[in-house]
Amino acid sequence: YAHLDQIDLNENDPITARWSAEAPYHSDKSTHLWIAKQAIEIMKTESNIEANKQAVDFLNYPQYKDLFSKGLYDADYNAEFNDGGTGIGGVFKGGWKSHFYDPDTKENYRGETNPTALTQGKKYFYESGEHLRNKDYEKAFYYLGVATHYFTDATQPMHAANFTAIDTRAIKYHSYFENYVTTIQNQFAVNTGGNYNNSLSTPEEWIDYAARVAKPEIQNITNDKTFKYYNSGKAQLWQEMVTPAVQRSLGEAQRNTAGFLNLWFKTFTKNVKAPSIETALIYDIEGNVIEAGKNYYIVPSESPYQGLTFEWYLANRYDYVTLANKENNGLSGTPMEFEFYKENDAKLHHGESIYLRMKHSNYDQFQYLNWSNYSSWIHLAQKSDSLADFKIKINLDNPTEYNIFTDDYPLNYENINAKKNWIVLGEKKQKPSSWKFIP
């Protein structure tokens, strides 16, 4: 599902503009994530099933939930999960051949038995389990997300039948189909009926089973009529034709993904208890939980009067983030808001992804902290799918202080005593600056 970058023939493609590789937590833009979240809802409803409550507790713990979601998303975009080489037909960079698996031939669309959605799903199922056994929970849930991505690939009829985006009968139909699915998937959400088939005892058996369930629907999605309507620009007609198959496929995908996740938790988490969400809450200096809709000053622990603020930079006319100047030991800076994703509970937790928004700036709407590959300086930007998200983490050396990260880079200040103190991204292995939050 949702390999929209497969159709990036040119930068003006109308579909690619709707998708970003930097929005991993939005289920309305990723059918993979939507299916996984629905599977977790099913397991929550059916908590009497062995390992289901444990799965829900782990996958709803904010830090692990985010890492799981990131793994689901990265599987489409990180080179280590894309074994396509030159690409589909030598045209596309990448190729995603490891995201396909025909259960009858055991092959991907290139006629190879490795890599496929089955071989890679199996690989990361066990790799994530090993990380959990080694108590590296962050890697465990990230790679479980990757494994689940490959599993949900197998639930998509086109991926189970090796129908690609450059099939000459309907160029890019694969991608337009997946885009259409994201617009209607909520109509077909289920929250009961998880498939916990005990006869399927390995990840490869589950992936093969899911593909066998999905593949027969290909005749209802790719046929002479749907191709005719698609090629003549009659989107409404082909969409009406495929909708019943989409409904059936998504129903099976949600229920079977619950079974796949159930197997992982039964296999690897016996006698392992999920941490309490209460232990992960982030607090301001007055001891209150950080919440959505409230304003805070973000200040260095060593200089609690210098809040983050902004300054216009003439060279490129951006607002850049700095520390406010000291003003007679009086608090200075720009109030900020922690902006949550709509699916979060509006209380901030350790390792949870949020946006950081200044309450005002020199440009309307350009108020969100962001960064680019061209500079380590933090600047202000508009809200978009490519906007940087930040994670607040408890400083283990001093639990009353916090570190701030984006994509594993620490948010740091350069020199607390400098006249101008720009906020920059440190190196991943560099000691992070410590921060506190003043309401």
Give a label for each model feature.
Residues 153, 157-160, 301, 313:
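An acidic- and aromatic-residue-enriched active-site/binding cleft used to recognize and process polar
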Residues 277-439:
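Lectin-like carbohydrate-binding module/patch detector with strong preference for beta-trefoil
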Residues 150-153, 410-412:
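Surface-exposed interaction patches
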Residues 140-152:
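Short alpha-helix carrying the canonical HExxH Zn2+-binding catalytic motif
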Residues 2-135, 139-142, 157-275:
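N-terminal, motif-rich segments that launch catalysis or mediate targeting to/interaction with membranes
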